């Protein structure tokens, strides 16, 4: 029984699904997808639970959310192992994900008060008030790269605001989704407030097609995000928050410390085996001897990165990708770039057949025409050279995406110029592209999405503002508008 609907664990009526460790092949989870009727059942449960949940005070809802945070803390080791084994990421990185889940809850609570709480302004004849109200029933689609942390970036603010939820984890991380849901169950969520439906494309299509849905919160690929946008087009009554991918540029201008710049680049491009939406995909390198020295050092250090199993000791920097298929897609992308004329500096290699252990790849594309503006979701870095900083900015903006952008340079003036001209939701200076703060917005423009699914800004799309003009008594104004006559004379 792997679906959680209206407070009960039930068996899915759809296709059977098996999840294996992407490195060892060990069977981790088995279950059945939710059928279309079960998706509708989850929606009815969420709709029925909404009025009571929304009418609870914020303090009452907050108690449940904080109880969940405590359960995350007490079950940290177990959840870390589940996420690591299912995604293939090393233990250390899965542990940072669970820590981020815990820390984000307190920030989400503070954000609700600051951004979407209640305000009152006194007026000469009354008061103006601002309140926020929940949308209703929301669908949350989770990604596989951070199967606990990123869905919770939607779920926690949505619950605090008073919404009820139908959560569909990625079909590649059903075990993590179930493990997190069981902690919510222990936290004491009333039946129907949060429902879990497992499944792939068919389940997702059934969920997004529900007429009685008030909104959809999505983190994942641009292709799926575009499909959801088309599916919900013509329905402005439904909130649609999309956090999608990026073809992110990292500009290496002047470098004072080559090793520090190489470390930043590796953290930007290869952490999580390149499976972060903010990862650097395009390295824009200033032409010249210093750029040559930097690139040679980057290749040398990257060559030492050997992916390993989640529990290897000593711990590896990167683990496997989410699946062997995902790893093979990266290799295929590299082969296509090489066939276009790219010069391979470091070839990505699958270490073992039937696993997802893939070494990083670096390929120079300077002077190659027609390179696709697509996100390769894995450890593959493409390199272009530039001559002037103005050219670097033009190259950085030459994408339909707009998620993250970074600059390595000692010159503040160049960063100020980039801040003015960059088309990206995240613009960093001498910091990895993959770094993020829950108190700052997280998201992009263009094909990278619309709203900002971090703890702080997620509050904005989880509730709608209600304005009120109020007075505790009704009196006739001392001064009337022209043409109004309230005298006692009878007009004949």
Swiss-Prot record:
GO terms of biological process kind: arginine catabolic process to glutamate; arginine catabolic process to succinate
EC number: 1.2.1.71
Pathway terms, separated by semicolons: Amino-acid degradation; L-arginine degradation via AST pathway; L-glutamate and succinate from L-arginine: step 4/5
Coiled-coil segments on the chain, per record: none
GO MF term list: aldehyde dehydrogenase [NAD(P)+] activity; succinylglutamate-semialdehyde dehydrogenase activity
UniProt keywords, alphabetically: Arginine metabolism, NAD, Oxidoreductase
Domain of life: Bacteria
Annotated active site: 243, 277
Family per similarity comment: Belongs to the aldehyde dehydrogenase family. AstD subfamily.
Protein name: N-succinylglutamate 5-semialdehyde dehydrogenase
Species lineage: Bacteria, Pseudomonadati, Pseudomonadota, Gammaproteobacteria, Enterobacterales
């Amino acid at each position: 029984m792997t679906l959680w609907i209206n407070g009960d664990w039930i068996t899915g009526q759809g296709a059977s699904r098996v999840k294996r460790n992407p490195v060892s092949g060990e069977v981790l989870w088995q279950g059945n997808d939710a059928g279309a009727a079960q998706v509708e059942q989850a929606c009815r449960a969420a709709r029925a639970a909404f009025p009571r949940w929304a009418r609870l005070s914020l303090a009452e809802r907050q108690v449940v959310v904080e109880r969940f945070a405590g359960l995350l803390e007490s079950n940290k080791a177990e959840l870390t192992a589940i996420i690591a084994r299912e995604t293939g990421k090393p233990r250390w990185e899965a542990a940072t994900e669970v820590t981020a889940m815990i820390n984000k809850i307190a920030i989400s609570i503070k954000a609700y008060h600051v951004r979407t709480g209640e305000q009152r302004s006194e007026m000469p004849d009354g008061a103006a008030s601002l309140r926020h109200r929940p949308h209703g029933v929301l669908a949350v689609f989770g990604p596989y790269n951070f199967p606990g942390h990123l869905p919770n970036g939607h779920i926690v603010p949505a619950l605090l605001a008073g919404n009820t939820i139908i959560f569909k984890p990625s079909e590649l991380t059903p075990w993590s989704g179930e493990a997190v849901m069981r902690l919510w169950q222990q936290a004491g969520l009333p039946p129907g407030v949060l429902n879990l439906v497992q499944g792939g494309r068919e389940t997702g299509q059934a969920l997004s097609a529900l007429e009685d849905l008030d909104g959809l919160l999505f983190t994942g690929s641009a292709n799926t995000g575009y499909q959801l946008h088309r599916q919900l087009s013509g329905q402005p009554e439904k909130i649609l928050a999309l956090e999608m991918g990026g073809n992110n540029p990292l500009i290496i201008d002047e470098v004072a410390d080559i090793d520090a710049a190489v470390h930043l680049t590796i953290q930007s491009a290869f952490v999580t085996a390149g499976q972060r939406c903010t990862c650097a995909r395009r390295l824009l390198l200033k032409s010249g001897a210093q750029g040559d020295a930097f690139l040679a050092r980057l290749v040398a250090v990257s060559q030492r990165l050997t992916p390993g199993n989640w529990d290897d000791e000593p711990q590896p920097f990167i683990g496997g990708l989410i699946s062997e298929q995902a790893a093979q897609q990266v290799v295929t992308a590299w082969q296509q770039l090489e066939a276009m004329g790219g010069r391979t500096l470091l070839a990505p290699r699958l270490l073992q057949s039937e696993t997802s252990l893939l070494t990083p790849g670096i390929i120079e594309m300077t002077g190659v025409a027609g390179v696709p503006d697509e996100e390769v979701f894995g450890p593959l870095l493409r390199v272009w050279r530039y001559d002037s900083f103005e050219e670097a900015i033009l190259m950085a903006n030459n994408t339909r995406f707009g998620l993250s952008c970074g600059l390595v340079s000692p010159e503040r003036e160049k960063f100020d110029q980039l801040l003015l001209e960059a088309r990206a939701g995240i613009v960093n200076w001498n910091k990895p592209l993959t770094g993020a703060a829950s108190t700052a917005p997280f998201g992009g423009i263009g094909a990278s999405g619309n709203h900002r699914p971090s703890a702080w800004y997620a509050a904005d799309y989880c509730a709608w503002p209600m304005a009120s003009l109020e007075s505790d008594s009704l009196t006739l104004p001392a001064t009337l508008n022209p043409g109004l006559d309230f005298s006692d004379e009878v007009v004949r």
